[in-house]
Amino acid sequence: SSLPFVKEGVKNVLAKVPAERTVVALPFYTRLWKEVKGKKPHPEAYGMSGAESVVRANDASPKWDEATGQYYAEFKSSGATYKIWLEEETSLKKKLEVVKKSKTAGVAFWKLGFERAVTWTTIADAVRGW
């Protein structure tokens, strides 16, 4: 999810639920969007390592997208355009900063097993002193 989506979601929830009763859930996965002219876009879910493998296998070059707070890559294959906004440690750290500033009761993640081992170091560093 994009950084603005997380910020807006936290803001909307906290308008109705006290921070001390709120746990914010963040994703360990992303979606690869397949776009074919004249057809509805088709998304496919990938964990962090799987998404990185798809990008690498297609020689795509992820670029940091300041607007979304994520790396973005795009490539073409078999007449389709593929787009992916990557969930990885840099984007996760930015989202964790938003959650920490909101002083919620905590944070949760979905889906376990879709993260990389190094992801837990990023999380531990971010929640220290929460």
What label would you give each PLM region?
Residues 21-98, 125-130:
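Glycan-binding loop/region signatures in secreted carbohydrate-active enzymes
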Residues 1-21, 62-64, 71:
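Short intrinsically disordered, low-complexity coil segments enriched in acidic
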Residues 96, 110-112:
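C-terminal functional modules
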Residues 3-14, 96, 120-127:
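Generic structural signal for well-ordered alpha-helices
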Residues 112-118:
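Acidic-and-aromatic substrate-binding clefts and catalytic sites of carbohydrate-active enzymes
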Residues 17-23, 102-107:
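Loop/turn elements at helix/coil->beta-strand transitions in domains of secreted/extracellular proteins
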Residues 1-7, 86-93, 114:
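Soluble non-cytosolic domains of exported or imported proteins
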